[in-house]
Protein backbone atom coordinates (compact mmCIF):
# COMPACT_ATOMS: atom_id res chain seq x y z
CA UNK A 1 0.00 0.00 0.00
CA UNK A 2 1.31 3.42 -0.90
CA UNK A 3 1.98 5.55 2.18
CA UNK A 4 1.02 9.21 2.01
CA UNK A 5 1.65 12.07 4.40
CA UNK A 6 -1.44 13.49 6.08
CA UNK A 7 -2.41 17.06 5.23
CA UNK A 8 -1.78 18.15 8.82
CA UNK A 9 1.69 16.60 8.93
CA UNK A 10 2.55 18.02 5.52
CA UNK A 11 1.47 21.47 6.72
CA UNK A 12 3.69 21.16 9.80
CA UNK A 13 6.69 20.16 7.68
CA UNK A 14 6.11 22.99 5.21
CA UNK A 15 5.68 25.47 8.06
CA UNK A 16 8.95 24.33 9.62
CA UNK A 17 10.79 24.60 6.30
CA UNK A 18 9.35 28.06 5.71
CA UNK A 19 10.65 29.22 9.10
CA UNK A 20 14.11 27.76 8.38
CA UNK A 21 14.31 29.52 5.02
CA UNK A 22 13.04 32.76 6.59
CA UNK A 23 15.83 32.64 9.15
CA UNK A 24 18.42 31.85 6.49
CA UNK A 25 17.26 34.70 4.28
CA UNK A 26 17.29 37.15 7.20
CA UNK A 27 21.00 36.65 7.76
CA UNK A 28 23.37 39.17 6.16
CA UNK A 29 25.42 37.75 3.30
CA UNK A 30 28.72 36.37 4.53
CA UNK A 31 30.35 36.89 1.14
CA UNK A 32 29.97 40.55 0.11
CA UNK A 33 30.21 41.33 -3.59
CA UNK A 34 32.47 44.31 -2.84
CA UNK A 35 36.03 43.02 -2.46
CA UNK A 36 36.98 46.12 -0.46
CA UNK A 37 35.63 44.74 2.81
CA UNK A 38 37.83 43.46 5.63
CA UNK A 39 35.97 40.24 6.37
CA UNK A 40 36.07 39.25 10.04
CA UNK A 41 32.61 37.71 10.45
CA UNK A 42 32.83 33.99 9.61
CA UNK A 43 36.10 32.83 11.20
CA UNK A 44 37.86 32.03 7.97
CA UNK A 45 41.64 31.77 7.85
CA UNK A 46 42.93 34.40 5.37
CA UNK A 47 46.41 32.98 4.87
CA UNK A 48 47.49 31.35 1.61
CA UNK A 49 47.68 27.59 1.31
CA UNK A 50 51.21 26.16 1.38
CA UNK A 51 52.75 25.80 -2.07
CA UNK A 52 52.63 22.00 -1.98
CA UNK A 53 48.90 22.07 -1.16
CA UNK A 54 48.22 24.52 -4.00
CA UNK A 55 50.13 22.27 -6.38
CA UNK A 56 47.98 19.31 -5.35
CA UNK A 57 44.84 21.29 -6.23
CA UNK A 58 46.21 22.21 -9.66
CA UNK A 59 47.23 18.60 -10.33
CA UNK A 60 43.73 17.42 -9.39
CA UNK A 61 42.26 19.54 -12.19
CA UNK A 62 43.90 17.17 -14.67
CA UNK A 63 41.47 14.51 -13.42
CA UNK A 64 38.39 16.72 -13.59
CA UNK A 65 36.76 14.44 -16.20
CA UNK A 66 36.76 11.49 -13.76
CA UNK A 67 34.35 10.90 -10.91
CA UNK A 68 35.95 11.11 -7.46
CA UNK A 69 36.14 8.08 -5.19
CA UNK A 70 32.65 7.28 -3.99
CA UNK A 71 33.89 6.16 -0.55
CA UNK A 72 36.62 8.79 -0.03
CA UNK A 73 38.95 5.92 0.87
CA UNK A 74 42.23 7.68 0.02
CA UNK A 75 41.31 10.67 2.16
CA UNK A 76 39.98 8.50 4.98
CA UNK A 77 43.15 6.40 5.02
CA UNK A 78 45.32 9.52 5.02
CA UNK A 79 43.35 10.96 7.95
CA UNK A 80 43.50 7.65 9.81
CA UNK A 81 47.29 7.54 9.42
CA UNK A 82 47.67 11.18 10.46
CA UNK A 83 45.48 10.87 13.57
CA UNK A 84 46.44 7.30 14.57
CA UNK A 85 43.08 5.72 13.81
CA UNK A 86 41.77 3.08 11.41
CA UNK A 87 39.95 3.99 8.19
CA UNK A 88 36.70 2.48 9.48
CA UNK A 89 36.81 5.04 12.31
CA UNK A 90 36.83 7.94 9.82
CA UNK A 91 34.17 9.58 7.68
CA UNK A 92 35.14 12.36 5.27
CA UNK A 93 32.67 15.10 4.43
CA UNK A 94 32.08 18.14 2.28
CA UNK A 95 33.02 20.23 5.30
CA UNK A 96 31.99 19.28 8.84
CA UNK A 97 28.62 20.97 8.16
CA UNK A 98 27.71 18.03 5.90
CA UNK A 99 28.62 15.65 8.70
CA UNK A 100 26.48 17.56 11.19
CA UNK A 101 23.56 17.25 8.79
CA UNK A 102 24.16 13.49 8.47
CA UNK A 103 24.21 13.10 12.25
CA UNK A 104 20.81 14.77 12.56
CA UNK A 105 19.38 12.59 9.78
CA UNK A 106 20.86 9.38 11.17
CA UNK A 107 19.87 9.78 14.81
CA UNK A 108 16.80 12.04 14.90
CA UNK A 109 13.22 11.76 13.77
CA UNK A 110 10.13 13.95 14.25
CA UNK A 111 9.50 14.54 17.94
CA UNK A 112 12.97 13.44 19.05
CA UNK A 113 15.26 15.79 20.93
CA UNK A 114 18.94 16.73 20.91
CA UNK A 115 20.75 18.49 23.77
CA UNK A 116 23.13 21.34 22.89
CA UNK A 117 25.21 23.64 25.06
CA UNK A 118 24.04 27.25 24.69
CA UNK A 119 25.27 29.62 23.44
CA UNK A 120 26.48 27.39 20.64
CA UNK A 121 26.64 27.03 16.87
CA UNK A 122 23.35 28.56 15.64
CA UNK A 123 23.20 26.30 12.56
CA UNK A 124 22.14 23.43 14.83
CA UNK A 125 18.76 25.09 15.41
CA UNK A 126 18.04 24.88 11.70
CA UNK A 127 19.18 21.26 11.47
CA UNK A 128 16.87 20.28 14.32
CA UNK A 129 13.93 22.09 12.71
CA UNK A 130 14.50 20.31 9.41
CA UNK A 131 14.21 16.94 11.19
CA UNK A 132 11.12 18.01 13.10
CA UNK A 133 13.13 17.55 16.31
CA UNK A 134 13.42 19.61 19.49
CA UNK A 135 16.66 21.32 20.40
CA UNK A 136 17.17 21.37 24.17
CA UNK A 137 19.51 24.26 24.87
CA UNK A 138 21.41 23.73 28.12
CA UNK A 139 23.16 26.81 29.46
CA UNK A 140 26.88 26.71 30.10
CA UNK A 141 27.80 26.85 33.78
CA UNK A 142 29.45 29.78 35.53
CA UNK A 143 32.86 30.61 34.02
CA UNK A 144 31.92 28.33 31.08
CA UNK A 145 32.11 25.18 33.20
CA UNK A 146 30.62 22.06 31.60
CA UNK A 147 27.17 21.48 33.21
CA UNK A 148 27.57 17.71 33.47
CA UNK A 149 24.66 17.19 35.89
CA UNK A 150 22.23 19.08 33.65
CA UNK A 151 23.35 17.05 30.62
CA UNK A 152 23.03 13.68 32.36
CA UNK A 153 19.71 14.26 34.13
CA UNK A 154 16.46 16.12 33.56
CA UNK A 155 15.10 16.72 30.03
CA UNK A 156 18.53 16.19 28.42
CA UNK A 157 18.44 12.55 29.57
CA UNK A 158 15.88 11.84 26.82
CA UNK A 159 17.97 13.40 24.05
CA UNK A 160 19.17 11.15 21.24
CA UNK A 161 22.60 12.76 21.44
CA UNK A 162 24.48 15.56 23.18
CA UNK A 163 26.24 18.18 21.09
CA UNK A 164 28.97 20.56 22.20
CA UNK A 165 31.91 22.38 20.67
CA UNK A 166 35.36 22.70 22.22
CA UNK A 167 36.56 25.42 21.86
CA UNK A 168 33.03 26.74 21.82
CA UNK A 169 31.56 28.95 19.11
CA UNK A 170 30.68 31.81 19.64
CA UNK A 171 32.45 32.27 22.98
CA UNK A 172 35.88 30.75 22.21
CA UNK A 173 35.97 29.17 25.68
CA UNK A 174 37.72 25.83 26.25
CA UNK A 175 36.69 22.94 28.49
CA UNK A 176 39.45 20.74 29.98
CA UNK A 177 39.53 17.34 28.29
CA UNK A 178 39.16 15.63 31.67
CA UNK A 179 35.70 17.22 31.97
CA UNK A 180 34.78 16.06 28.46
CA UNK A 181 35.89 12.54 29.36
CA UNK A 182 33.77 12.58 32.52
CA UNK A 183 30.68 13.45 30.48
CA UNK A 184 31.35 10.78 27.85
CA UNK A 185 32.13 8.11 30.44
CA UNK A 186 28.97 8.80 32.46
CA UNK A 187 26.57 9.26 29.53
CA UNK A 188 24.52 6.53 27.87
CA UNK A 189 24.03 8.81 24.87
CA UNK A 190 26.16 9.61 21.87
CA UNK A 191 28.29 12.69 22.56
CA UNK A 192 29.12 14.72 19.44
CA UNK A 193 32.14 16.94 20.05
CA UNK A 194 32.88 19.58 17.42
CA UNK A 195 36.59 20.46 17.46
CA UNK A 196 36.53 22.91 14.55
CA UNK A 197 38.86 25.32 16.40
CA UNK A 198 41.02 22.84 18.28
CA UNK A 199 44.30 23.79 16.56
CA UNK A 200 44.17 27.12 18.40
CA UNK A 201 43.53 25.40 21.76
CA UNK A 202 45.83 23.70 24.29
CA UNK A 203 44.46 20.15 23.98
CA UNK A 204 42.20 17.78 22.04
CA UNK A 205 39.87 14.90 22.86
CA UNK A 206 41.22 12.82 19.96
CA UNK A 207 42.82 10.31 22.35
CA UNK A 208 39.36 9.50 23.73
CA UNK A 209 38.03 8.15 20.42
CA UNK A 210 39.61 4.72 20.97
CA UNK A 211 38.40 4.59 24.58
CA UNK A 212 34.69 5.35 24.19
CA UNK A 213 32.24 4.00 21.62
CA UNK A 214 29.77 6.84 22.32
CA UNK A 215 32.10 9.70 21.31
CA UNK A 216 31.94 11.20 17.81
CA UNK A 217 34.57 13.86 17.10
CA UNK A 218 34.24 16.40 14.28
CA UNK A 219 37.09 18.28 12.59
CA UNK A 220 37.26 20.72 9.67
CA UNK A 221 39.99 22.20 7.49
CA UNK A 222 38.01 25.46 7.15
CA UNK A 223 39.35 27.26 10.22
CA UNK A 224 42.95 26.40 10.98
CA UNK A 225 43.96 25.10 7.54
CA UNK A 226 42.67 27.94 5.32
CA UNK A 227 40.49 25.70 3.14
CA UNK A 228 36.94 26.89 3.87
CA UNK A 229 36.08 27.18 0.18
CA UNK A 230 37.33 23.69 -0.63
CA UNK A 231 35.08 21.98 1.96
CA UNK A 232 36.95 19.22 3.81
CA UNK A 233 35.75 17.82 7.13
CA UNK A 234 36.09 14.62 9.15
CA UNK A 235 34.26 12.60 11.75
CA UNK A 236 36.17 10.24 14.05
CA UNK A 237 34.35 7.60 16.06
CA UNK A 238 33.44 3.97 16.64
CA UNK A 239 33.14 1.97 13.38
CA UNK A 240 29.43 1.28 14.01
CA UNK A 241 28.65 4.99 14.40
CA UNK A 242 30.78 5.90 11.38
CA UNK A 243 29.15 3.14 9.34
CA UNK A 244 25.68 4.41 10.19
CA UNK A 245 26.62 7.85 8.85
CA UNK A 246 28.34 6.54 5.73
CA UNK A 247 25.30 4.43 4.88
CA UNK A 248 23.21 7.57 4.33
CA UNK A 249 25.95 9.73 2.80
CA UNK A 250 25.52 10.78 -0.82
CA UNK A 251 27.69 9.14 -3.43
CA UNK A 252 30.51 11.39 -4.71
CA UNK A 253 29.89 13.84 -1.86
CA UNK A 254 33.37 15.34 -2.33
CA UNK A 255 35.14 16.42 -5.50
CA UNK A 256 38.64 15.54 -6.72
CA UNK A 257 40.08 18.89 -5.58
CA UNK A 258 38.74 18.39 -2.06
CA UNK A 259 40.26 14.91 -1.97
CA UNK A 260 43.64 16.09 -3.22
CA UNK A 261 43.84 19.15 -0.99
CA UNK A 262 42.71 17.16 2.05
CA UNK A 263 45.40 14.52 1.56
CA UNK A 264 48.03 17.20 0.96
CA UNK A 265 47.08 19.21 4.06
CA UNK A 266 47.35 16.06 6.16
CA UNK A 267 50.83 15.48 4.76
CA UNK A 268 51.91 19.07 5.49
CA UNK A 269 50.15 19.86 8.78
CA UNK A 270 53.39 21.01 10.41
CA UNK A 271 53.76 23.81 7.84
CA UNK A 272 50.69 25.50 9.36
CA UNK A 273 52.29 25.93 12.80
CA UNK A 274 53.52 29.46 12.05
CA UNK A 275 50.04 30.38 10.80
CA UNK A 276 48.54 29.20 14.09
CA UNK A 277 51.16 31.04 16.16
CA UNK A 278 50.41 34.26 14.29
CA UNK A 279 46.68 33.96 14.96
CA UNK A 280 47.24 33.30 18.67
CA UNK A 281 49.57 36.33 18.85
CA UNK A 282 47.11 38.62 17.03
CA UNK A 283 44.25 37.30 19.15
CA UNK A 284 45.99 38.46 22.32
CA UNK A 285 47.03 41.79 20.81
CA UNK A 286 43.47 42.56 19.73
CA UNK A 287 42.05 41.39 23.06
CA UNK A 288 44.26 43.82 24.97
CA UNK A 289 43.48 46.68 22.57
CA UNK A 290 39.70 46.14 22.77
CA UNK A 291 39.84 45.93 26.56
CA UNK A 292 41.56 49.32 26.66
CA UNK A 293 38.74 50.73 24.53
CA UNK A 294 36.08 49.65 27.02
CA UNK A 295 35.08 46.26 25.58
CA UNK A 296 34.74 43.21 27.83
CA UNK A 297 36.47 40.41 25.94
CA UNK A 298 36.04 36.72 26.70
CA UNK A 299 39.38 34.83 26.83
CA UNK A 300 39.46 32.77 23.62
CA UNK A 301 41.07 29.55 22.45
CA UNK A 302 39.76 29.91 18.89
CA UNK A 303 40.55 32.15 15.90
CA UNK A 304 38.03 34.78 17.02
CA UNK A 305 37.11 36.94 20.00
CA UNK A 306 33.70 37.51 21.58
CA UNK A 307 33.57 41.12 22.75
CA UNK A 308 30.84 42.76 24.81
CA UNK A 309 30.57 46.33 23.54
CA UNK A 310 30.75 49.41 25.80
CA UNK A 311 27.52 50.38 27.56
CA UNK A 312 24.99 52.45 25.67
CA UNK A 313 25.02 50.59 22.36
CA UNK A 314 24.41 47.01 21.21
CA UNK A 315 26.08 44.61 18.82
CA UNK A 316 23.84 45.52 15.89
CA UNK A 317 24.83 49.20 16.22
CA UNK A 318 28.53 48.37 16.25
CA UNK A 319 28.09 45.97 13.32
CA UNK A 320 26.45 48.74 11.28
CA UNK A 321 29.11 51.34 12.19
CA UNK A 322 31.95 48.98 11.33
CA UNK A 323 30.27 47.92 8.09
CA UNK A 324 30.15 51.56 6.98
CA UNK A 325 33.92 51.53 7.41
CA UNK A 326 34.17 48.34 5.31
CA UNK A 327 34.77 46.08 8.32
CA UNK A 328 32.52 43.03 8.72
CA UNK A 329 32.02 41.42 12.14
CA UNK A 330 29.37 39.00 13.39
CA UNK A 331 26.34 39.78 15.50
CA UNK A 332 24.81 36.85 17.35
CA UNK A 333 21.24 35.51 17.72
CA UNK A 334 21.80 33.98 21.17
CA UNK A 335 19.95 35.30 24.20
CA UNK A 336 22.28 37.37 26.37
CA UNK A 337 24.68 38.19 23.54
CA UNK A 338 22.73 41.11 22.06
CA UNK A 339 25.43 43.54 23.18
CA UNK A 340 28.28 41.48 21.73
CA UNK A 341 30.19 41.23 18.48
CA UNK A 342 32.34 38.32 17.36
CA UNK A 343 35.56 39.23 15.55
CA UNK A 344 37.59 36.76 13.48
CA UNK A 345 41.36 37.02 13.82
CA UNK A 346 43.05 37.61 10.47
CA UNK A 347 46.29 39.10 9.22
CA UNK A 348 48.02 41.95 11.05
CA UNK A 349 46.93 44.53 8.42
CA UNK A 350 43.33 43.32 8.73
CA UNK A 351 43.40 43.60 12.51
CA UNK A 352 45.09 47.01 12.33
CA UNK A 353 42.24 48.20 10.08
CA UNK A 354 39.65 46.79 12.49
CA UNK A 355 41.24 48.43 15.55
CA UNK A 356 41.60 51.76 13.75
CA UNK A 357 37.88 51.66 12.87
CA UNK A 358 36.92 50.80 16.46
CA UNK A 359 39.07 53.64 17.81
CA UNK A 360 37.49 56.07 15.35
CA UNK A 361 33.95 55.02 16.30
CA UNK A 362 34.79 55.13 20.01
CA UNK A 363 36.31 58.60 19.66
CA UNK A 364 33.27 59.90 17.82
CA UNK A 365 31.02 58.56 20.58
CA UNK A 366 33.04 60.17 23.35
CA UNK A 367 33.07 63.56 21.63
CA UNK A 368 29.27 63.77 21.62
Curated annotation (Swiss-Prot):
Which catalytic reaction applies to this protein?
L-histidinol phosphate + 2-oxoglutarate = 3-(imidazol-4-yl)-2-oxopropyl phosphate + L-glutamate
User: What pathway does the UniProt record associate with this protein?
Assistant: Amino-acid biosynthesis; L-histidine biosynthesis; L-histidine from 5-phospho-alpha-D-ribose 1-diphosphate: step 7/9
Q: Which UniProt keywords apply?
A: Amino-acid biosynthesis, Aminotransferase, Histidine biosynthesis, Plasmid, Pyridoxal phosphate, Transferase
N6-(pyridoxal phosphate)lysine occurs at which residues?
223
Entry's EC annotation? 2.6.1.9
Q: Which cofactor does it need?
A: pyridoxal 5'-phosphate
Stored InterPro entries: Aminotrans_II_pyridoxalP_BS, Aminotransferase_I/II_large, HisP_aminotrans, PyrdxlP-dep_Trfase, PyrdxlP-dep_Trfase_major, PyrdxlP-dep_Trfase_small
Which biological process annotations from GO are given for this protein? L-histidine biosynthetic process
Tell me where on the tree of life, at the top rank, the source sits.
Bacteria
Family matches, as CDD domains: AAT_like
Q: A Pfam family this protein belongs to?
A: Aminotran_1_2
**Assembly information from the UniProt record:** Homodimer.
Q: Which family does it belong to?
A: Belongs to the class-II pyridoxal-phosphate-dependent aminotransferase family. Histidinol-phosphate aminotransferase subfamily.
Entry's NCBIfam families? hisC
Entry protein name: Histidinol-phosphate aminotransferase
Question: Which source organism?
Answer: Sinorhizobium fredii (strain NBRC 101917 / NGR234)
Amino acid sequence: MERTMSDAKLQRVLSSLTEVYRQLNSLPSSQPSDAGYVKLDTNENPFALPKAVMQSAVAALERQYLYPEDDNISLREAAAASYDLSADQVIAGNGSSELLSLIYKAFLGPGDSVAMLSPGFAYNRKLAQLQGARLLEIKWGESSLLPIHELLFGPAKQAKFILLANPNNPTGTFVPIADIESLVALSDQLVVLDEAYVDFAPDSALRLVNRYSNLLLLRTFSKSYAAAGIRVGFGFGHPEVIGRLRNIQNMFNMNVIGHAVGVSILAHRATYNENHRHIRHERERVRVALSRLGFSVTPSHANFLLARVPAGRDGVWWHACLKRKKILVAVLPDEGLEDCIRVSIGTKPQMDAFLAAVEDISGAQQSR
